Amino acid sequence: MLTIALSKGRILDDTLPLLAEAGIVPTENPDKSRKLIIPTTQADVRLLIVRATDVPTYVEHGAADLGVAGKDVLMEYTGQGLYEPLDLQIAKCRLMTAGAIGAVEPKGRLRVATKFVNVAKRYYAEQGRQVDIIKLYGSMELAPLIGLADKIIDVVDTGNTLRANGLEPQELIATISSRLVVNKASMKMQHARIQALIDTLRKAVESRHRC
């Protein structure tokens, strides 16, 4: 049995057509189903529906053989038990700093609100900047508006939400897309099966970008 971990939302919507190229189609609509384990048209393949931030954990610990996760999630994740063989080039966005429009950056310690704590620590350490990191799980845009933080680090798509809240995107930390991740032990035990799937997905990605 091959288990693939996916998260609902944009990544799931963009991944399903790629899996269909490999003949893997869920037997019911994951967006409408309450089931968290969904069979597919291939009897030996099932989908596991989990939170986006949990995909690497399920894959590393062998609860899933493969998964699809945003590069932002993988950058934040600290585990080591994953291969990242393929950029699926879907769910593209940017990981950026943002602050109040026209605000002057303080010269002393910078207060940064984000759910990407590990990314933030690395980013500012590379700059040699002293920062206080405030972990938030949502509504990042509030932090600079009410004086909780000077800046935020978050995923930015169009930037409309930032601008609607009086913020502007600033430094680009990374360009984000979703990646296929594979459990290291699964890659050894089911190498032929998984490699065939990787090859099929790679061809599907390349075909889309030739069009």
UniProtKB/Swiss-Prot annotation:
Lacks the C-terminal regulatory region which is replaced by HisZ. Gene3D superfamilies: Periplasmic binding protein-like II (3.40.190.10). Catalyzes the condensation of ATP and 5-phosphoribose 1-diphosphate to form N'-(5'-phosphoribosyl)-ATP (PR-ATP). Has a crucial role in the pathway because the rate of histidine biosynthesis seems to be controlled primarily by regulation of HisG enzymatic activity. GO terms for biological process: L-histidine biosynthetic process. It catalyses: 1-(5-phospho-beta-D-ribosyl)-ATP + diphosphate = 5-phospho-alpha-D-ribose 1-diphosphate + ATP. Pfam families: HisG. One of its GO terms (cellular component) is cytoplasm. Its EC number is 2.4.2.17. Keywords: Amino-acid biosynthesis, ATP-binding, Cytoplasm, Glycosyltransferase, Histidine biosynthesis, Nucleotide-binding, Transferase. This is ATP phosphoribosyltransferase. GO terms for molecular function: ATP binding; ATP phosphoribosyltransferase activity. Heteromultimer composed of HisG and HisZ subunits. It is found in: Cytoplasm. SUPFAM superfamilies: Periplasmic binding protein-like II. The lineage of its organism: Bacteria, Pseudomonadati, Pseudomonadota, Gammaproteobacteria, Pseudomonadales. It is an enzyme of class 2 (transferase). NCBIfam families: hisG (TIGR00070). It comes from Pseudomonas syringae pv. tomato (strain ATCC BAA-871 / DC3000). The keyword Ribonucleoprotein does not apply. HAMAP family: HisG_Short. The keyword Magnesium does not apply. Pathway: Amino-acid biosynthesis; L-histidine biosynthesis; L-histidine from 5-phospho-alpha-D-ribose 1-diphosphate: step 1/9.
